[in-house]
Structure formats: structure tokens, C-alpha cells
């Protein structure tokens, strides 16, 4: 059974992993990955950002600055206890991780289903971002009808664990502003980076993974594709591949 309660699983005193969840999500999205990494001997720290830390029918409004402040505080606490810190971001956790890596020393960076733009369907008249910054200004919350997980049993478990039944649009707009802040910094980010993206993602545009890969200044970077998963790949049909690739990357010598 999945839980949405933040946890610290301590192992090695040398290397800790900070796991960053997605917008409107929580620890449950990365719980199984965190447990796997702990079983492989790594220390794992998860958090629920401010505005994501209490159950509510409607997701409350929060800003990327609030989320990043929490990320930075946790990172700084970990640096007092561990020799090296790696960051694993999922969805909106990816631009947060990139923003952190642009200003602080990160051992390794893993980006799962990175949110750089919203998935555009051919039948949309305009990009989704255009709606968000126009008529979307009149609406605070929209229903979240179904979690983007193809694994039916895992989707049921995630539905039980999630805190919110809606998406807060002001928070989505704030996440897009964070992405605008991150893009100019990519060329200066030199940390070794693994990007894992599914071609079947129904939430974010999969080309965002290629954009990051091409723009990153790191000489050590890898883009790994999935072909059977939806957006929440750490809980989906190919989660074992995700776990193995992430652990292998974290353990590889630079």
C-alpha cells in the first residue's frame, strides 16, 4: 500500500538521495523508488512541498518559490550529514532539481518525466499554456479525474494515497514560471544527469526530455526512453526498469 507521508531511510553516511515529487502529487509518486534505493544501500529523503503537505479535496494555491525554499532547506540539512547529495526529480520536481543544481553542488541528477511543457494534442486550437494564462485565469481548480498510470492496480493504490482531487491552476502557472527561470540556466549545469521519459506520456510533452538533454552543459548525460508507461513512470508498468537505471546511474563512477 502506498503512503503520502514523507520519510527518511538512512543507510550510507556518504551518499544521500533527495527525491522531489510532482505538482499536485506527493511522496507516494516516488515511494517505491525510494524504498528500492534504500534496499540497495543508499540513504533516501523525501518531502512534500509546502501547499502539498495536507489532505484536502481541492489543491491549495502555492508558488514555486515556496516549493524551492523547502527543497533548499532540506538539501542544506542533508549536506550537514552526508558527503554527497544526489537529487531525483519527478515531473515538476525536475525543474526544481535543475534550479538547485544551477546554484549548489549536486553529485548526480536524475530527471523522471521532466515537466518542461504540457502535452499538446492535435485537436487543441492553442497550446495548453495559452489557455492557462488567458481563460484559465478565471478558474482556480479543475478536477483531476484519473491519475496517469497504465498499471491498473497501482493506479488504484495511488488514488488512495493522493491528497487532492483537483489541480490548482495558479500553481500550474507558477510551475511554468519556474520552467522559464530554469531554461536559461541549463547550459551552465555541469552535473552528471540521467533523464528517463516515456513516449506514451499523456501529461508532459516528451520532447521536453530531448530539450533538456540537448541544452544541458554536462558532458555526462543520458536519455533513456520508456515505451509502455504513462506520466508517473516510477509507479507504472516499467517501474523496474526505472529503478534499475536510476540505481545504476547513481553508482557509476564519474
Report residues per predicted region:
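Gly/Ala-rich beta-loop-alpha elbow adjacent to hydrolase catalytic centers
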Residues: 89-93, 97
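Short alpha-helix in the alpha/beta-hydrolase fold that links the catalytic acid
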Residues: 33, 191, 205-214
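Conserved alpha/beta-hydrolase
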Residues: 38-56
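The serine-hydrolase catalytic nucleophile loop
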Residues: 24-34
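Short beta-strand/loop motif that positions the catalytic acidic residue
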Residues: 189, 195-197, 201
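Active-site nucleophile elbow and catalytic-triad environment of alpha/beta-hydrolase enzymes
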Residues: 168-185
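Catalytic histidine neighborhood in serine/cysteine hydrolases
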Residues: 210, 214-232
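Catalytic active-site module of serine/aspartate enzymes centered on a nucleophile-bearing elbow/loop
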Residues: 227-254
Amino acid at each position: 500500500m502506498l503512503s503520502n507521508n514523507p520519510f527518511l531511510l538512512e543507510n550510507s553516511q556518504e551518499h544521500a538521495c533527495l527525491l522531489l515529487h510532482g505538482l499536485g502529487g506527493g511522496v507516494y509518486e516516488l515511494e517505491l523508488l525510494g524504498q528500492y534505493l534504500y534496499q540497495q544501500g543508499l540513504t533516501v529523503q523525501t518531502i512534500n512541498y509546502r501547499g502539498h503537505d495536507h489532505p484536502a479535496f481541492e489543491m491549495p494555491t502555492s508558488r514555486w518559490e515556496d516549493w524551492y525554499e523547502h527543497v533548499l532547506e532540506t538539501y542544506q540539512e542533508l549536506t550537514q550529514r552526508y558527503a554527497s547529495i544526489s537529487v531525483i526529480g519527478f515531473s515538476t520536481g525536475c525543474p526544481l532539481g535543475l534550479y538547485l543544481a544551477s546554484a549548489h553542488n549536486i553529485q548526480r541528477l536524475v530527471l523522471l518525466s521532466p515537466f518542461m511543457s504540457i502535452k499538446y494534442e492535435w485537436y487543441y486550437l492553442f497550446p495548453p499554456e495559452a489557455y492557462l494564462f488567458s481563460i484559465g485565469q478565471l478558474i482556480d481548480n479543475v478536477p483531476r479525474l484519473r491519475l496517469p498510470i497504465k498499471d491498473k492496480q497501482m493506479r488504484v493504490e495511488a488514488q488512495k494515497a493522493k491528497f487532492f482531487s483537483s489541480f490548482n491552476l495558479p500553481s500550474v502557472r507558477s510551475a511554468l514560471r519556474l520552467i522559464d527561470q530554469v531554461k536559461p540556466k541549463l547550459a551552465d549545469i555541469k552535473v552528471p544527469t540521467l533523464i528517463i521519459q516515456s513516449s506514451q506520456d499523456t501529461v508532459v510533452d516528451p520532447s521536453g526530455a530531448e530539450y533538456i538533454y540537448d541544452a544541458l552543459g554536462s558532458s555526462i548525460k543520458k536519455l533513456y526512453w520508456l515505451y509502455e508507461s504513462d506520466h508517473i513512470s516510477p509507479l507504472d508498468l516499467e517501474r523496474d526498469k526505472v529503478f534499475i537505471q536510476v540505481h545504476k546511474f547513481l553508482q557509476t563512477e564519474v
